[in-house]
Each structure stands twice: as C-alpha cells, then as structure tokens.
C-alpha cells in the first residue's frame, strides 16, 4: 500500500486560498535551505503518518504484516525509499521538471489476511489519504493560532501553509482511481469481482500511466485542482469556529 505518496504538478495550488490568505506558489520554485526546510518538515510528517496509517488500519482489520515488520511507526526512516523519496524528486528538481513525483517504501499488506478482504481493503486504502486530511486540519489550526496570537514569524507561517497544501495534495493525488494509488485500491474494492480483476491488471503499468498523465497536465488540470479546491472548501468551515474566536 502507498507505493506513491507524492505526485504534485507545480502550480496546481495557485488557485487555492484559506481564509484571506493565498498559498505562495513560489514556495515550490525556491530551493533555498529555508524553503526546503519549510516544505520538508510537513512533507516528512505527511508521508510518515500516511504510511503508518495504512499499516495501522491493516492491523485493525486483521493483517499484522506491517506491524510485525516495524512499519506501524512514526519513524520516517522506516518509510523512506532512497530512490523514490530522495533521488527521483531531487533529480526532477535539478532538471527543472514541470512536475514532482516520488514514492515512499510501500507498506506491505496481505489482503488475504484481512477479515473481509473486499471491504477491508477499501478502509485500509482510505486510511492514508484520511490521515492527510486530518493533518491538513491540524496545520490549518496551527496557522489560525499563529495569526490569532499575532506571531509574526514567516518561517512558521510558511510551514503552516505548506503543511496544509502538501497534505491536501497527497490526499487528492492518492485518491486518483488508478492502481497502485490508494484510489485504485478503493475502486477495485467497489467494482464487481470480474471487473476488479481486470482493473487490477493495470497495476504493473500504473507508474508509467501516472507519469504520462502528470506530464500532459491531465491530472493537474482535471483532478488535482478541482479536488484540492473541494477539500480546502471542507477544511475552511471545519476551522472557521476557531477563526471566529480570534476575529474582533
């Protein structure tokens, strides 16, 4: 589970706002040490908790594989893949690629060990994106508290924004309905058995299909942007009561 944990076309956040603030898209194209730290800290949390959530959900529904291998942990080193999490993103950045894509070390899930494989597979797949949604809310609350207490610290403000949008981005991207993404697992669990088997045959080619769709801008324009707006629109009212506390 969770072979892909990041696939973000640069600039797809440009139309997204939270309250009266807009996300600074330049944060994606600024590769200073400070900008890297601003993005890396929430991104490491986003990836680590995403993968651990898959393992925890699998254990909850009967498969202890990830737990026995020590993957139900918040230690990011357990989830980092040297190639997919480090080398590929760095190479794309240095090449000034129009998109960033990477993946963490997949959390092993034995679907045949789940008590109700067809249904439980959906919940295990949803756990990762669900954790990113919760983290987006956390970072939104952090942002509101910073503003509410008049903490004028650009580093913390930028990190809060990055935390919201990396998590929304990972949430939306991983819900794309193509294996090995979480959305593909969810769709496979919903489809009738025969159609699910046929759909599963796409998985060996999923990585290349996703790259092609990223390169052509299809995922960014027709999936990432509208669904990011949708989930931001959900986060905003959930955090509005706290925002009202600090509004004169």
Where do the PLM segments sit?
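Hydrophobic transmembrane alpha-helices and their immediate loop junctions
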Residues: 4, 10-13, 19-248
């Amino acid at each position: 589970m969770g072979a892909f944990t990041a696939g973000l076309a640069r600039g797809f956040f440009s139309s997204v706002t939270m309250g009266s603030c807009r996300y600074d898209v330049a944060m994606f194209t600024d590769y200073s040490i400070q900008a890297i730290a601003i993005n890396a800290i929430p991104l490491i949390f986003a990836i680590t908790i995403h993968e651990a959530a898959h393992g925890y959900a699998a254990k909850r529904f009967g498969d202890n594989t990830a737990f026995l291998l020590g993957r139900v942990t918040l230690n990011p080193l357990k989830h980092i893949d040297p190639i997919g999490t480090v080398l590929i993103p760095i190479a794309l950045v240095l090449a000034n690629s129009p998109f960033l894509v990477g993946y963490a070390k997949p959390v092993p899930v034995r679907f045949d060990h789940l008590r109700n494989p067809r249904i439980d597979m959906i919940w295990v797949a949803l756990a990762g994106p669900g954790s990113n949604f919760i983290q987006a809310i956390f970072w939104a609350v952090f942002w509101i508290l910073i503003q509410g207490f008049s903490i004028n610290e650009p580093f913390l403000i930028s990190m809060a924004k990055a935390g919201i949008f990396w998590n929304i981005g990972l949430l939306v991207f991983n819900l794309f309905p193509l294996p090995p993404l979480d959305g593909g697992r969810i769709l496979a669990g919903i489809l009738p058995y025969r159609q699910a088997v046929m759909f599963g045959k796409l998985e060996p080619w999923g990585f290349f299909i996703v790259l092609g769709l990223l390169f052509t801008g299809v995922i960014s324009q027709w999936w990432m942007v509208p669904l990011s707006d949708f989930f931001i629109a959900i986060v905003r009212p959930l955090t509005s009561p706290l925002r009202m506390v600090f509004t004169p």
